[in-house]
Amino acid sequence: MTDFWNERYAQEEYAYGLQPNVFFKDAIGEIPKGKLLFPAEGEGRNAVFAAQLGYEVYAFDTSKEAKIKADKLAEEYGVTLDYNVGNLEALNYPENYFDAVILIYAHVPAEVRTEFCQHLLRLLKPNGQIIFEGFSQEQLKYTSGGPKNSEMLFSESQVKNDFPNVAFNSLSTEVISLDEGKYHQGLGSVVRFRAKKLS
C-alpha cells in the first residue's frame, strides 16, 4: 500500500485538495489549544489548518511523498508540523500525551485496525478528544473514493468496538457530498463521530 500512496502523492497537484475536511473544520473549535495528532495525514491539509489556528501539530503517514507535500504546504502557510514517516507502532509517541486525535479517512487493514485504534487511545490524555470521519461500508455503492475492500470500511458498531472507554458526543452514518480534490468527488457514505476518552 505504501507504493500506492507514494505514487498518488508524487503527483504535482494535491490529491485531496488544500482545504481542510469540512467535519473536522466544524469540530476543531471545541478543542482547547494543545497537542493534536493526525494519523495517516497524507498531504497535510488538515494538519496545516490546525497549525494555522495555533495548535501544536503532530502527524504521520507511511508515505514519504506525503510528507514532502505536507512540508511544502506548511512552508507556504508559514507554520510548523512535527511530521514523521512510518507506522504508528514504530514512532514511539508517549502515552497520555495528546489532547486530541484527528482521524480523517484513516483506513487501515482489518487485521490491524482494532489495535491501531486502541493504540491511539493510549496516546490520548484522559478527557482527550477524537474527531473521526471515514467511509462506511455503504460506500461500495458510490464512486466518490475510498477502499474497495469492505473490510477496510467502517460501521457504527465496529467503531464502538474499536474505541472502548470513550463517551461519544455524536456518532452517525451519513450520505454527504464530497468535494475534496481529485479523488473525493460526489456523493459518499461516511461514519462520523466526536468522542472523549473517559480515563
Give names to the regions the model predicted.
Residues 114-126:
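A short glycine-rich, Lys/Arg-flanked "PGG" loop and its adjoining helix->strand segment in the class I
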Residues 63-65:
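Conserved SAM/SAH-binding beta-strand->alpha-helix loop
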Residues 151-173:
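Short alpha-helix
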Residues 127-135:
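Conserved beta-strand signature within the Rossmann-like core of class I S-adenosyl-L-methionine
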Residues 1-31:
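Conserved class I S-adenosyl-L-methionine
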Residues 89-100:
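A short acidic, Gly/Pro-enriched loop at the edge of an enzyme's catalytic core
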Residues 99-114:
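A short SAM/SAH-binding and catalytic strip from SAM-dependent methyltransferases
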